[in-house]
Amino acid sequence: MFEVTVVSSEFDAKIQQKIDTKTKPLGALGALETLAMTIARVLGPDKPQITKPTLLVFAGDHGIAASGVSIAPSEVTTQMVMNFLKGGAAINLFCAQGGITMEVIDCGIAQEIHDQPKLINHRLGAGTGAIHREPAMTLGAVKQGFAMARERVALHHGRGCNLIAFGEMGIGNTSSAAAIMAALMGREAAECVGRGTGIDAATLARKQLLVEQALFLHREQLGDPYGVLACLGGFEIVQMTGAILAAAELKMLVLIDGFIATAAALAAVTIAPHARDYMIFAHESGERGHKLMLEHLNAQPLLSLGLRLGEGTGAALAVPLVQAAATFYNEMASLEEMGISI
């Protein structure tokens, strides 16, 4: 469905030489140098510019939420979507501060919102099935979600965006992400399930049990990533996965947020391994399992702030770092130009 090509290594030596000969000791800009390499490899070695950074927030509800895996009821998904639309959430403020275009997409919240022209309708249903009792969705819904996401990413690419990030909102979605992680990485539920919105020990134990039940129930369908997404995914996680693949196909930089987004990235890389080449990982969240996924994907996150809010907040905070890496790569003087000997 997606044709994601490997990022060429043809200019790696040229890019590295340009980084190494800036007016600084070798490696003195640390992770920004690695980031500059990624930017130049994806966008080209000659003055790559970050243009029209964009963040899409995908929202969807989860049937498993009715079983008490979160401190919040599923109604909060709709309430928070309205908060996004009114500009009152953390992600709104961070995007405004960073000059990031933000868009909110209803992938399948339980309570449909009407008369909100800024809300993009990508509804695949009114919440997923409860994954510990039934599949989250059909394979057809996965494919439809991919197609919708691809179209949206292509729209922003056509408008000049070459750095895209994704956030999410969905009560219960850390349960879905943990199940996806366990299925795709062959891990035990206990290694993947965390406290999400801040649940207590009893709720954590119940959440882990339900994820274990989901993995056992669908064990015959978890042999490929499409089956994993259909059985265990969320409508917002599916569309995020499709959006990551679409952006990689279009050779855009893809900024990955926290635990949920990394589960979508894991699914995307399982489908198209070269998608990994286009990814920048914004931060390591406070959610159990995120570090394991980052290690599995050989990812070095830019930030470690203990964030566990979701929404794409970590990605939005990382955009200025991406811009800074491009700026030093393009504009910092060379040792030769300045006559400096190090």
Swiss-Prot record:
The active site is at 311 (proton acceptor). This is Nicotinate-nucleotide--dimethylbenzimidazole phosphoribosyltransferase. Pathway: Nucleoside biosynthesis; alpha-ribazole biosynthesis; alpha-ribazole from 5,6-dimethylbenzimidazole: step 1/2. InterPro entries: Nict_dMeBzImd_PRibTrfase, Nict_dMeBzImd_PRibTrfase_bact, Nict_dMeBzImd_PRibTrfase_N, Nict_dMeBzImd_PRibTrfase_sf. GO terms for molecular function: nicotinate-nucleotide-dimethylbenzimidazole phosphoribosyltransferase activity. It catalyses: 5,6-dimethylbenzimidazole + nicotinate beta-D-ribonucleotide = alpha-ribazole 5'-phosphate + nicotinate + H(+). HAMAP family: CobT. Pfam families: DBI_PRT. PANTHER family: NICOTINATE-NUCLEOTIDE--DIMETHYLBENZIMIDAZOLE PHOSPHORIBOSYLTRANSFERASE. Keywords: Cobalamin biosynthesis, Glycosyltransferase, Transferase. It comes from Shewanella loihica (strain ATCC BAA-1088 / PV-4). The lineage of its organism: Bacteria, Pseudomonadati, Pseudomonadota, Gammaproteobacteria, Alteromonadales. GO terms for biological process: cobalamin biosynthetic process. Catalyzes the synthesis of alpha-ribazole-5'-phosphate from nicotinate mononucleotide (NAMN) and 5,6-dimethylbenzimidazole (DMB). Its EC number is 2.4.2.21. Gene3D superfamilies: 1.10.1610.10, 3.40.50.10210. Belongs to the CobT family. NCBIfam families: cobT_DBIPRT, PRK00105.1. The gene is cobT.
